[in-house]
Design a protein with these regions (language model features):
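A short coil-to-beta-strand element that immediately follows conserved catalytic motifs
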Residues: 88-97
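A structural signal for short, well-ordered beta-strand segments
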Residues: 35, 63-64, 94, 115-117
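Acidic, metal-coordinating catalytic segment for phosphate/diphosphate chemistry
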Residues: 1-34, 40
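Nudix hydrolase/Nudix homology domain
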Residues: 19-21, 58, 96-101, 108-181
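Conserved Nudix-box catalytic region and its N-terminal flanking loop in Nudix hydrolases
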Residues: 22-33, 43-84
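Histidine- and/or cysteine-centered catalytic micro-motif in compact active-site loops
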Residues: 40, 49-51, 97, 122
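Conserved active-site beta-strand-loop modules that form the wall/rim of enzyme catalytic pockets
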Residues: 42-45, 91-92, 115
Length: 181
């Protein structure tokens, strides 16, 4: 079954629906989201993508990411995917948005207007093995060290988020999530 995404312009205005695989083959700018879940001890939840994923399999990434469906609100899509991938339900707060374009393989390009959401996880993940191979908590100050130590083990969008917003940005997102929970 084909999956459709929302093609957008550089200001995140919707243009039309686009087939997910075509969007990634052709590098079509589309709407996406990235979720960062924190615990109350200052750790961030990372997931290792399942080996069967069509791109970036086996790489470590932020807590959850995905795309809204056409006619689906981005925040609602983030809540939906968090439950589908990790079996978690929690309040999510929008904290940032940015645009990036990166090749993720010889054939596929991520060109996303990425909305970043944060939340506090109070339960343990119950991941769908088709989506998530493993998960782990990492002390937030260690994230940038891990990205530098083993860059090939992490998704390109996690690198771009860490570069763009820095350790201070992620710390402020955690504080924002705690204040909102």
């Amino acid at each position: 079954m084909k999956e459709f995404l929302i093609a957008v312009d550089a200001e995140d205005r919707p243009l039309h629906a686009v087939d997910k695989m075509n969007a990634h083959r052709e590098g079509v700018l589309h709407r996406a989201f990235s979720i960062f879940l924190f615990d109350t001890q200052g750790q961030v939840l990372l997931q290792q993508r399942a080996l069967g994923k069509y791109h970036s399999p086996g790489l470590w990434s932020n807590s959850c990411c995905g795309h809204p469906r056409p006619d689906e609100e981005t925040g609602a899509a983030a809540v939906r995917r968090l439950h589908e991938e990790l079996g978690l339900q929690c309040a999510l707060q929008p904290v940032a948005a940015f645009l990036y374009r990166e090749a993720v393989s010889k054939e596929l390009i991520e060109h996303e207007y990425d909305h970043v959401f944060v939340g506090i996880a109070r339960d343990l993940p119950q991941p769908d093995p088709r989506e998530v191979r493993e998960w782990r908590w990492l002390a937030l100050p260690d994230l940038h060290h891990e990205l530098a130590r083993a860059p090939a083990h992490f998704t390109i969008w996690l690198h771009r988020i860490a570069e763009r917003f820095g350790a201070e940005g992620l710390q402020s997102w955690r504080a924002h999530a705690l204040a909102a929970s």
